[in-house]
Amino acid sequence: MSATVLVVRPRAQALAWVDELAALGVAARALPLIEILPAPDAARVEAAFAQVEASVAAPVLVFVSPNAVLGFFAAVASARGVGAPAPAWPTHARAAATGPGTVAALRECGVPGECIVAPAAAAEQFDSEALWAQVADWPWAARSVWIVRGNGGRDWLGQQLRDAGADVRVVQSYARVAPALDDGERALLAQALAEPVRWIWMFSSSEAIAHLQALAPGARWDAARALASHPRIAERATALGFGAVAIVAPSTAAVAAAVSAMTAN
């Protein structure tokens, strides 16, 4: 039986995924369950980047997501004002990324490929653990590291870096909040709740699942199906009550293959 994928990423990303899935022959709709806001303190983000630019050592900025990258460079540009040149990446600095989407965002913002470190494109997972496996043997003692992220999030990687002797600071380059669904999105949510077998949810964050639970309190999920981009996210979907949950790599090609497998039965 065919099914339509519900892409719950932030609105702009969700719409892009819908188009990419359509090109692969997969029906999809955007139902954003996370809204992205700008950095709450652009001046603080710019100050961090200025320190990186002025450093004579080899500082590292760890970007945890594409939103972290885009929010960071937008905040720097905003703080420096209209007419200022676009921020150029200092080649003595390294940009660490947790996955291919973050790498793509860095390249889009002008970071040279030779300055980027990330898990291999064929890695089984794209997360802090996979990134740490790539850089654990770097010389971290007294090295300056900025972790660029949104509000909240795990501190696992930060703790590994501190234990290795790095001077770790956290920079918030964007904020994640619960979405304000428009009328069409609310109607789509109602359809998905009324006919769960017609849909497959695609989750790329546990926070999106929490927002879904808040938007549909008391809903039954035992007939619903989901794809999750990480085991922790799959655990959260299972805990909410989803009847079938599969783990899939965070790419449209992988999602298309998983949808085909899930709907074959």
Residue ranges and their predicted role:
Residues M1-N265:
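Conserved beta-alpha
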